[in-house]
Amino acid sequence: MSPPRQRKCVIGLGMACLDQLLLWADTSAPVQGNRLIACQWQGGGPAGTAMVTVARLGGRAEIWAAVGDDWIGDLILRGLAQERVDTSQVVRVRGGRGTHMIACIDQPTGERHFYRGTEYVHSGRPVGDLKRLRGAGCLLVDGTRPASELRAAREGRRLGVPVVADVGWWTRERPAVLTHVDYAILSEHSARSLAPRGAAGKTARRARERASAEPLDLRMICQAVRGMGPPRVVITLGARGLVYLDGERFGRMKAFRVKVVDTTGAGDVFHGAFCWGLVAGLALEKNLEFASAAAALKCGHIGGRAGIPTRRQVVRFLSEHAGQ
């Protein structure tokens, strides 16, 4: 059965940027003698990619962000507008550059490493008109603008607008925002930041290496995050799927098996598809499945934007992979 159509607007607050994508034969090898297979430029950013996903799926999307008044900012806005994302709440920062990110992609695995090409653009004032939250279907905050997202999440909660937090990395500002969040979606990296630390006496580097090799108590981490406010918590685990906590129910979901070309933007596409499904009225498990399918389809293409699927493509993919 096809999911219902999404009608209310999804608002994404955070970063929109321009990605320079470099596909290497082997990112672990020295640059000298290595082979650059492809180079592309695409729009990116957690909130930016998520809102393009909403639009590709047939929903209404609006982004609250800040970009420079340079050529990079022009390209960012042009790309969003071409995808029918409302950019009326994007602040142009005078003298600002970018934001521009560089992604080095490993061809054998599809994994990538990010480097900041230009400084993150800061706005001297909060982004977004809070009045626009009235009647919105969902608010997504990506963690890149703590003051603005706390202000918006608090107002969204007051108005009864579902608030989704992209917790791709953990910062000291996140707990304050999570008190106003309905759905917290953590990356595995962020989840590891909340795991118990290694034994005293280890160097910081050795402690990090040990932590990355140890299995996580995912249920405990979900419960810890829920204790900060969000009644529903999701931890995405890449090729290992995801886990979720809905009230007292703890569940797991496998990832779809696909040929991975590039994982850039997969999490952002997941967040955008999840917001679309939330507004469309999908039940939590169906929504997680829908978002996982959208992210899997994206992984078959270079970059975070080129592979974002349409609603029809996701529905067909789910039909073909039923029971996987």
Predicted regions and their residues:
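Conserved phosphate-binding/catalytic loop of the ribokinase/pfkB sugar-kinase fold
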Residues: 92-93, 103-143
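A glycine-rich helix N-cap at a beta->alpha junction
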Residues: 79-95
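Anion (oxyanion) recognition and catalysis
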Residues: 55, 81, 157-158, 226
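Conserved beta-alpha-beta core of the PfkB/ribokinase-like small-molecule kinase fold
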Residues: 138-220, 240-242
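Glycine-rich phosphate/adenosyl-contacting loop at the front of the ribokinase-like
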Residues: 1-66, 71-75, 82, 108, ...
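Conserved phosphate-binding/catalytic region of the ribokinase-like
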Residues: 1-12, 35, 198-324
